[in-house]
Design a protein with these regions (language model features):
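Short S/T/G/P-rich N-terminal loop/turn motif that feeds into the first structured element of a domain
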Residues: 1-50, 56-192
Length: 192
């Protein structure tokens, strides 16, 4: 499985237009695209959002690169700068709830980005410290992680903000106990 994560910075006052664009243009444009397994979009603030797409393979994503670029060019009218894009093979993840394509269910996304000092150490931290927190949590839908070179990106989607916030506190405590500076070059950034 291969992921592409796009993090746009939205212009002030453009959030509602961007939401409509994603619902009416992006989701319909990519519906039934061969090799595209899932697509998720979230607004993480008044001027920030996340689009995450899962593909069968890197080649499946590359086969629609022109379509992706066309839609990004159209979305530029909502952005204050070019989006940050991360891509990579899945290195961790689990589906806790199966949600059908046409099923409407709220989800609260938490995505964390950090520049890893050692990718293996960060992956071990996720498996040994983060996964047990996930396993004991209520309301978790899906988790995952990729590396784009030495940048680690992990995410989780929750049924409610309360469930996400409760887990986020435990996850931050785990990171603090491990010493974030031993794992990452600088602080991690969380989008929620």
């Amino acid at each position: 499985m291969y992921f592409r994560i796009t993090i746009p910075s939205l212009q002030d006052g453009k959030k509602d237009e961007a939401i409509s664009f994603v619902k009416e243009r992006v989701m319909t444009e990519f519906d039934n695209t061969p090799g595209l397994l899932s697509m998720t979009a979230a607004i993480t603030g008044e001027t920030s959002g996340i689009n995450m797409a899962a593909y069968e393979s890197k080649e499946a994503m590359e086969s629609i690169a022109d379509k992706i670029q066309t839609v990004l060019a159209e979305a530029a009218v909502f952005m204050s700068a070019p989006p940050v894009i991360y891509q990579g093979d899945a290195v961790f993840g689990k589906v806790y709830q199966t949600i059908g394509k046409d099923e409407k269910k709220p989800g609260y996304l938490r995505l964390v980005v950090g520049v890893a000092k050692d990718n293996d150490a960060v992956l071990n931290f996720i498996k040994e410290k983060v996964q047990p927190i996930y396993e004991e949590s209520e309301g978790l839908q899906i988790t995952g992680a990729i590396f784009d070179e030495n940048t680690g990106i992990s995410w989780s989607i929750w049924d409610s903000q309360a469930a996400m916030d409760e887990a986020a506190t435990q996850l931050q405590n785990a990171l603090d106990s491990e010493s974030e500076s031993d794992l990452f070059d600088g602080a991690t950034v969380a989008y929620m």
